[in-house]
């Protein structure tokens, strides 16, 4: 649910926000909620709109792309160039900086495969904000929580300082993974 707060705070800062939720994200938060928070229509699949090529338009229109939360599955698909959904296809199109905000169970976060996939993304100039430590889903605690919204915003916008005026930016948020 932090992705909803992220959208709200970015809008309060004067940025345009477009949300590209994964099917998993829509199981947690409905498209209507994302649309209400962002003030923009929500696309979740490549095939929803016949009047535009969604991943091309969305990817080209973004000044910054934030993937929050980024699951182990999403990280793996991005690291290996998958383009089988709107999120991954949009990542392949965008020239904007991409910020990855991992969120998963500690055992998954510490898994060698996840760490290797993150290294691949870092080599491609993706910016990774490490997960926070705290209570996880269920009764477990440890590393794996989505970073706090203020940290995500500060680190993400710092990537653009010096290159753009930091108001009225078009920020793409992908929710869930």
Where do the model's predicted regions map?
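A cross-family phosphate/adenosyl-ligand binding-site feature
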Residues: 1-99, 105-177
């Amino acid at each position: 649910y932090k992705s909803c707060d992220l959208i709200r705070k970015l809008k309060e800062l004067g940025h345009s926000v477009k949300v590209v939720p994964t099917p998993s994200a829509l199981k947690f938060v409905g498209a209507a909620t994302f649309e209400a928070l962002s003030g923009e229509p929500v696309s979740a699949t490549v095939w929803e709109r016949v009047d535009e090529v969604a991943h091309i338009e969305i990817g080209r229109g973004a000044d910054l792309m934030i993937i929050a939360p980024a699951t182990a599955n999403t990280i793996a698909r991005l690291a290996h160039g998958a383009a089988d959904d709107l999120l991954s296809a949009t990542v392949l199109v965008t020239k904007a900086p991409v910020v990855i905000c991992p969120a998963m169970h500690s055992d998954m976060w510490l898994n060698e495969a996840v760490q290797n996939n993150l290294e691949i993304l870092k080599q491609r100039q993706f910016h990774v904000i490490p997960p926070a430590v705290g209570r996880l889903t269920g009764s477990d605690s440890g590393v794996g929580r989505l970073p706090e919204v203020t940290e995500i915003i500060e680190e993400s916008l710092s990537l653009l300082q010096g290159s753009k005026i930091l108001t009225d930016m078009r920020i793409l948020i992908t929710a869930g993974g």
